[in-house]
From Swiss-Prot:
InterPro entries: PMDh-S-like, PMDh-S-like_dom, PMDh_S. Its EC number is 4.2.1.182. Heterodimer composed of a large subunit (PMDh-L) and a small subunit (PMDh-S). It catalyses: (R)-5-phosphomevalonate = (2E)-3-methyl-5-phosphooxypent-2-enoate + H2O. This is Phosphomevalonate dehydratase small subunit.
């Protein structure tokens, strides 16, 4: 059954493969993520205490200040950024952050990612061609 591909919309070009980390909560990169370590520091966030470094980060959309784009860039410079991002629908703050940081980003998948992805899955995000590919299923639970 694996691999499985789903088409989406390209926001930021490039390709990256990595382990999925899912949040149903929006993310504000300014104040919610430590730009030195990539650890989510927002206490009430579903990913509090977890690192986004090197992960394929799945979240619905961004929130908060426009400075969040530059925090994403700082994460990349500090080698603490996610490998790639999948959004339900990307807003401008996350789009700009991904583009200037060269983080592949795809949104608006033809199937809701929360229905088929779970923490620990291995996914390829192809931002250049606008698709994601589920390569390996992990041991985690789907986030419904």
């Amino acid at each position: 059954m694996i691999p499985i591909k789903f088409k989406g919309r390209t926001i930021s070009r490039g390709c990256a493969e990595g382990e999925v980390l899912i949040s149903r909560d929006p993310i504000s990169f300014l104040g919610s993520v430590d730009p030195r370590t990539g650890i989510v520091v927002e206490e009430k966030h579903s990913l509090a205490g977890k690192s986004i470094k090197g992960k394929v980060l799945v979240f619905p959309h961004g929130k908060g200040s426009t400075v969040g784009s530059y925090v994403m860039y700082q994460l990349k410079k500090n080698e603490a950024a996610p490998a790639a991002i999948i959004n339900l629908e990307t807003e401008p703050i996350v789009a700009v952050g991904a583009i200037i940081s060269e983080i592949p980003l795809v949104d608006m998948l033809e199937k809701d990612p929360y229905e088929f992805l779970k923490d620990g899955d291995t996914v390829l995000v192809n931002g250049s061609e606008g698709y994601i590919e589920l390569l390996k299923q992990g041991e985690g639970q789907a986030k419904k």
